[in-house]
Amino acid sequence: MSSLPVIILVIGIFGSIFLVIGYIPQVIKVIKTKRTDGISLTFLISLNIACFLFVIYSILVMIFNKHNGIPTALPLCLANTIVGILGLVILIYKVKNIKKAKLYLMDEKTYYEKYVLNNL
């Protein structure tokens, strides 16, 4: 293996690691506080669609580019799988909060402050 594919692989691995590390604190915060009113639903849906598409893309690269596909696409596949799962966790909290707020005829922030915050 020449040095260029190794450099590309290392960049992919570090990019993937930082992508996952950057996402973990937000997921922990949402799980602990159950607060999602500051996170856009459009963002979460777009993120999950993007992660899904990147996973499909990287799998296709690994299948059809057998010479260099697996080393270069594997970090992308793993990172987007993990971030997609983490994003899905936040999306589930977000949708639950929106539904509960609508039951009380409130916006998400008011619902959180009135019903969730006092129970933490």
From Swiss-Prot:
The alphabetical list of record keywords is: Cell membrane, Membrane, Transmembrane, Transmembrane helix
Annotated transmembrane regions: 4-24, 44-64, 73-93
- Primary location: membrane
- InterPro entries hit by this protein: PQ-loop_rpt
Regarding the membrane, this protein is recorded as: Multi-pass membrane protein
Q: Where in the cell is it found?
A: Cell membrane
The cross-references to Pfam families, in alphabetical order and at most eight, read:
PQ-loop
Under the cellular component aspect of Gene Ontology, which terms does the record hold?
plasma membrane
- Note whether Membrane occurs among the keywords: yes
- Describe the family membership recorded for this protein in Swiss-Prot or TrEMBL: To U.parvum UU007, UU008 and UU042.
In Swiss-Prot or TrEMBL terms, this protein is called: Uncharacterized protein UU041
Q: Which organism is it from?
A: Ureaplasma parvum serovar 3 (strain ATCC 700970)
> What lineage is on file?
Bacteria, Bacillati, Mycoplasmatota, Mycoplasmoidales, Mycoplasmoidaceae
